[in-house]
From Swiss-Prot:
Record text on subunit structure and interactions: Homotetramer.
EC numbers, comma separated: 1.1.1.205
Positions with a binding annotation for K(+): 326, 328, 331, 500-502
Regulation acting on activity, per entry: Mycophenolic acid (MPA) is a non-competitive inhibitor that prevents formation of the closed enzyme conformation by binding to the same site as the amobile flap. In contrast, mizoribine monophosphate (MZP) is a competitive inhibitor that induces the closed conformation. MPA is a potent inhibitor of mammalian IMPDHs but a poor inhibitor of the bacterial enzymes. MZP is a more potent inhibitor of bacterial IMPDH. Subject to product inhibition by XMP and NADH. Also inhibited by ADP.
Organism, scientific name: Homo sapiens
Location(s), subcellular: Cytoplasm; Nucleus
Cofactor(s) of this protein: K(+)
Residues annotated with Phosphoserine modification: 160
Descriptive protein name: Inosine-5'-monophosphate dehydrogenase 1
Induction: Constitutively expressed.
Modified residues (Omega-N-methylarginine): 341, 355
Role of this protein: Catalyzes the conversion of inosine 5'-phosphate (IMP) to xanthosine 5'-phosphate (XMP), the first committed and rate-limiting step in the de novo synthesis of guanine nucleotides, and therefore plays an important role in the regulation of cell growth. Could also have a single-stranded nucleic acid-binding activity and could play a role in RNA and/or DNA metabolism. It may also have a role in the development of malignancy and the growth progression of some tumors.
Length: 514
């Protein structure tokens, strides 16, 4: 027998890799590219991996993905798409309070069970009023009541079929002349269950099902499009009223309290306090204010990168923490301010501390690939916030433009001079609203068209599931348990190892991800 072979069976297994505690015991700060996770044992298929994870103390998502509150990433279209696929979007606040509240309202109205506050018109309104409502809200199936309000007697309904072929000169036509009259409508009685109402809607083959009381007064409405959305998006993030979940960002100054009032009136589910450095007297005071005035509202504090920063916000009463400082692709905070922390270390250190108090953390920034998402979750993050990864998608705000034959969309940091010049909200985020000289902490750029997140996010979800499968974790909660117990093992990567782990040795190649 060769002298290098060991006889006696395979019971002996040498210790291999580092625990997370050992990995981050050194004084060096680590980013996601600085380490790998060692594989485990596979005894399940990737589709079985449960990605359910906590956003805050009281809000749980079926997909651990969040869109960042940036003005080139998240408005209503992005927030709707993210919620439909099990995540959530945070509407940016680099705009007027009224605009932001209206974007939240669009998300909350997008998909519902019983719609109790639909757009309602009267017979004396015109076709032009319907077209205006369609342009503003994106739908045209509008119930008609005697007074044009909920709780009034139902007299008909106007759908696109009633007005599609009317000429522009007919836009002044009264709805009483074009509406489908009450006698031809299929309705359901008040008190009907959502399941029963859905069955009636399916049998009737109508687009809308009005719900009326004993006096034939309109009390709610159900839309066929919502049935289709329920079928197509089983993971959708919804509140107790079956409305899509929506978050929004606010600042920490006195005038942000008015913005907060409008957002709560619009039905926002969770607030993120948007600051580049969250460990401040301003943010602590705002947390106290929100918890006193709106105790039901979930509040996410941040941004933080140390346990000491996290402690002050947890003591103030936050329900979640946003972790990251200077690690975003468009952020130059570390370069300009000399403050920040490598994101891998920041996520691990803050998550390890915050979990003792039941506070979930969001890994915000530095996410370039689906592998980075898996690493962030393996270090203790409950969810991952994405900016550049979602920028230049169809759902991101802004118009496409061409440069050198490439289709692009603008993407900028909220600390860029571009963003600061648009609104004072960006200046407040970086504590510079009173400065005579503005110090940029971000840049403006452009990103190549990525298409719709309807294709991109499913790719991310599948990638996370396959990553967990290779690790041997059936769920994200199991993944975190493996990390904290020491079962999950890591290994540092040299620069040569990073080169080896990427594409190399080819004359040319095409990198198609999905």
């Amino acid at each position: 027998m060769a002298d290098y072979l060991i006889s006696g069976g395979t019971g002996y297994v040498p210790e291999d890799g580092l625990t997370a505690q050992q990995l981050f015991a050194s004084a060096d700060g680590l980013t996601y590219n600085d380490f790998l996770i060692l594989p485990g044992f596979i005894d399940f298929i990737a589709d079985e991996v449960d990605l359910t994870s906590a956003l805050t103390r009281k809000i749980t998502l079926k997909t651990p993905l969040i869109s960042s509150p940036m003005d080139t990433v998240t408005e209503a279209d992005m927030a709707i798409a993210m919620a439909l696929m099990g995540g959530i979007g945070f509407i940016h606040h680099n705009c007027t309070p009224e605009f932001q509240a209206n974007e939240v309202r669009k998300v909350k109205k997008f998909e519902q069970g019983f719609i109790t506050d639909p757009v309602v018109l009267s017979p004396s309104h015109t076709v032009g009023d319907v077209l205006e409502a369609k342009m503003r809200h994106g739908f045209s199936g509008i119930p008609i009541t005697e007074t044009g309000t909920m709780g009034s007697k139902l007299v008909g309904i106007v759908t696109s079929r009633d007005i599609d072929f009317l000429a522009e000169k007919d836009h002044t036509t009264l709805l009483s002349e074009v509406m489908t009259p009450r006698i031809e409508l299929v309705v359901a009685p008040a008190g009907v269950t959502l399941k029963e109402a859905n069955e009636i809607l399916q049998r009737s083959k109508k687009g809308k099902l009005p719900i009326v009381n004993d006096c034939d007064e309109l009390v709610a409405i159900i839309a066929r499009t919502d049935l289709k959305k329920n079928r197509d998006y089983p993971l959708a993030s919804k509140d107790s009223q079956k409305q899509l979940l929506c978050g929004a960002a606010v600042g920490t100054r006195e005038d942000d309290k008015y913005r907060l009032d409008l957002l709560t009136q619009a039905g926002v589910d969770v607030i993120v306090l948007d600051s580049s450095q969250g460990n401040s007297v301003y943010q602590i005071a705002m947390v106290h204010y929100i918890k006193q005035k709106y105790p039901h509202l979930q509040v996410i504090g941040g941004n933080v990168v140390t346990a000491a920063q996290a402690k002050n916000l947890i003591d103030a009463g936050v329900d979640g923490l946003r972790v990251g400082m200077g690690c975003g692709s468009i952020c130059i905070t570390q370069e300009v301010m000399a403050c920040g922390r490598p994101q891998g270390t920041a996520v691990y250190k803050v998550a390890e501390y915050a979990r003792r108090f039941g506070v979930p953390i969001i890994a915000d920034g530095g996410i370039q690939t689906v592998g980075h998402v898996v690493k962030a979750l393996a270090l203790g993050a409950s969810t991952v916030m994405m900016g550049s990864l979602l920028a230049a998608t169809t759902e991101a705000p802004g118009e496409y433009f061409f440069s050198d034959g490439v289709r692009l969309k603008k993407y900028r940091g909220m600390g860029s001079l571009d963003a600061m010049e648009k609104s004072s909200s960006s200046q407040k985020r970086y504590f510079s609203e009173g400065d005579k000289v503005k110090i940029a902490q971000g840049v403006s750029g452009s990103i190549q068209d990525k298409g719709s997140i309807q294709k991109f996010v499913p790719y991310l979800i599948a990638g996370i599931q396959h990553g967990c499968q290779d690790i041997g974790a059936r769920s994200l909660s199991v993944l975190r348990s493996m990390m904290y117990s020491g079962e999950l093992k890591f290994e540092k990567r040299t620069m040569s190892a990073q080169i080896e782990g990427g594409v190399h040795g080819l004359h040319s190649y095409e990198k198609r991800l999905y």
